[in-house]
A protein has these predicted regions:
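Short-chain dehydrogenase/reductase
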Residues: 1-4, 60-63, 89
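Glycine-rich Rossmann NAD(P)(H)-binding loop
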Residues: 20-23, 44-50, 75-83, 105-112, ...
């Protein structure tokens, strides 16, 4: 980011949380959990940690919305909700009907917050709903 700021006057930096979508990278949070659970491989989980997850299609929709406005040099695009790691694991277990095998680790880290440019007005315009079903719907969409 500093490289871009120093060298380009006209720029936009877009930051995202963990994205849910089709990705060949096995080390993304969602692929890691899905691959370990579906193959019954044991893993460690900070079950009390919270993560911000966003469907990649919603990320694109929000990105284009902000880029059209042309008034931001830096944009933080995120879900308004944070999900406990245990909830993410449980939703994947429910989808594939395989119990996760994991060691519970205590969270040594402070859960982080993102200064989010996304607000309810924008979500209403774009018809994006971060409701109770958002996480499970997004997981089903890409991992079913």
């Amino acid at each position: 980011e500093n490289f871009i700021r120093k060298r380009f006057h006209d720029h936009t930096i877009v930051r995202y949380p963990e994205l849910i979508g089709v990705c060949k990278n096995k080390n993304t949070l969602m692929n890691f959990f899905f691959n370990h659970i579906s193959s019954s491989n044991k893993f460690s989980a900070y079950v009390d940690a919270k993560r911000n997850l966003l469907d990649v299609e919603d990320a694109l929709c929000l990105t284009f919305y902000f880029l059209k406005k042309k008034k931001f040099k830096e944009i933080n695009i995120a879900n308004q909700k944070y999900y406990k790691v245990l909830k993410i694991i449980k939703d994947i277990e429910k989808l594939i009907d395989i119990p996760a095998i994991y060691y519970i680790k205590k969270n040594k880290f402070i859960n982080w917050k993102i200064k989010n440019h996304v607000n309810n007005k924008i979500l209403k315009i774009l018809k994006i709903k971060f409701d109770k079903k958002y996480l499970s719907t997004s997981i089903n969409k890409y991992f079913a």
